[in-house]
A protein has these predicted regions:
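Short alpha-helical segments that sit at the start of domains
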Residues: 1-20
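Short capping segments at the starts of secondary-structure elements
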Residues: 16, 28-32
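Pre-recognition alpha-helix immediately N-terminal to the DNA-recognition helix
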Residues: 19-23, 81
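Residues within the helices of the helix-turn-helix
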Residues: 23, 33-34, 52
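Conserved segment of winged-helix/HTH DNA-binding domains
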Residues: 27, 72-94
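A short acidic, leucine-rich amphipathic alpha-helix
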Residues: 35-39
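Key DNA-contact positions within bacterial/archaeal DNA-binding proteins
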Residues: 45
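Beta-hairpin "wing" of winged helix-turn-helix
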Residues: 57-67, 74
């Protein structure tokens, strides 16, 4: 098993909102934070904070970094790999 994938899966798993955001982006391709907040039921401040953390770990990609409003986010291939790992492990454990 890839150690980096395990570390990132742990990073996502310890904060359930991160997994909600990744799932939302995976299901919707490109979204702005307010759309993510609406779709997940999370507060916009929480979404913005978690997106920053997910971006630092290269799990999401900011398409228009020069914009202050209307920032477009997309899940990365690494983010999809982490989600697939978590979803597989969750199914095995249930």
């Amino acid at each position: 098993m890839d150690k980096k994938l395990l570390v990132l899966a742990t990073f996502v798993k310890i904060a359930p909102n991160r997994q909600k955001i990744l799932n939302c982006l995976h299901n919707n391709d490109v979204l702005i934070p307010t759309e993510i907040a609406k779709a997940t039921g999370l507060h916009i401040n929480s979404v913005s904070k978690q997106l920053r953390y997910l971006r630092e770990k290269e799990l999401v990609y900011l398409l228009n970094p020069d914009y202050k409003r209307g920032r477009l986010y997309r899940i990365t291939d690494l983010g999809i790999d982490v989600l697939n790992f978590l979803n597989t492990k969750t199914k095995i454990n249930h």
